[in-house]
């Protein structure tokens, strides 16, 4: 009864008004699974390829009709009749059908839409919520949210080079309370920014995007908001940064326009980050160095890797081959997990498992271009990942994930576990 009998791909829109791929999978029993894939703005060069049409007369060349056509033709022909409960076999079928190392022929967006929709259909068929279907009886842990309350870089139109300034409610007793704490800080921050005469417009991920004099000014705004909301920075709410350093790495230097255009070597940039870590309660730094600057990453890890979570996003691109190289070379201590960077659920889960075995944390993440699809919330719980990045406390495309996690926590009841600071088990 779990045989796949129909697949339909379609072009829909993401949160930036750009096309993305959605897929419906129908099983013999009559149940259906639906999934839509996200899209990034700052992307790693080694990510699986997102297939776009390139036709400038439609959506400025960003249409995805080719990817949709692949779903409705050769992917459909290859997977019709397969058992939806055999996720690994289905994903391998997609990988073999594509035949490239980076999924450039069929498109990772086409393949992921099918992979996710099949999992949703199989979960529905089994009568289990998606998180339980994906993780079995072990999925009891809610993730600690890393909430992006100030946006910069490629996600905003302001003077900040760093892409995300996040609050992390490590002291909350539950996920529900963590969300409440985050929302209250978000609203306090809005008032502070407004009272200073700055814009309260939000960026792609729902955080504010004020034009401030430098990066420390942004951090200080957040600390003021934490205090105004009645919480203690560090003890109750820690800070995290996503530098997205590849975006400002030019000719072997880190060029910070938001700091007066200074040009820093990797060592000097590490010194600046270390100064911030000493001065502020920062416990996580993502993409602190450019994806190709492995020497810089090594220096950063040696300097800060014992007391700060160093997350590789563009560095590892959810790819087990690259992650293994990083583990072998002691680069970073955490991986960001973005399902569309690799293109199938099976490969996503393999990256999470590899990270955990090596003592690295795995942070489940959205993309800046999102939809109402909340699959990553279920993945975070199903894999006991412990951490999630899904934006600020605004924009329905971000809130969809928080709301799904609230439902999951309610469903788990007394056995739900919120790890708080223990989710950062890579810190000594």
Curated annotation (Swiss-Prot):
Catalysed reactions listed for this entry: (2R)-2-phosphoglycerate = phosphoenolpyruvate + H2O
Cell location: Cytoplasm; Secreted; Cell surface
Necessary cofactors: Mg(2+)
Binding locations of (2R)-2-phosphoglycerate: 163, 338, 367-368, 389
Annotated pathway: Carbohydrate degradation; glycolysis; pyruvate from D-glyceraldehyde 3-phosphate: step 4/5
One GO CC annotation: cell surface
Active site as annotated: 205 (proton donor), 338 (proton acceptor)
Sequence positions that bind Mg(2+): 242, 286, 313
Predominant location category: cytoplasm
Keyword field contains Metal-binding: yes
Keyword Cytoplasm attributed: yes
Cofactor remark: Binds a second Mg(2+) ion via substrate during catalysis.
Enzyme class label: lyase
GO BP of this protein: glycolytic process
Alphabetized UniProt keyword annotations: Cytoplasm, Glycolysis, Lyase, Magnesium, Metal-binding, Secreted
Domain of life of the native organism: Bacteria
EC number(s) per entry: 4.2.1.11
A GO term, aspect molecular function: magnesium ion binding
PANTHER family for the chain: ENOLASE
Protein task: Catalyzes the reversible conversion of 2-phosphoglycerate (2-PG) into phosphoenolpyruvate (PEP). It is essential for the degradation of carbohydrates via glycolysis.
Family: Belongs to the enolase family.
Entry-linked HAMAP family: Enolase
Protein name: Enolase
Organism of provenance: Paracidovorax citrulli (strain AAC00-1)
Organismal lineage: Bacteria, Pseudomonadati, Pseudomonadota, Betaproteobacteria, Burkholderiales
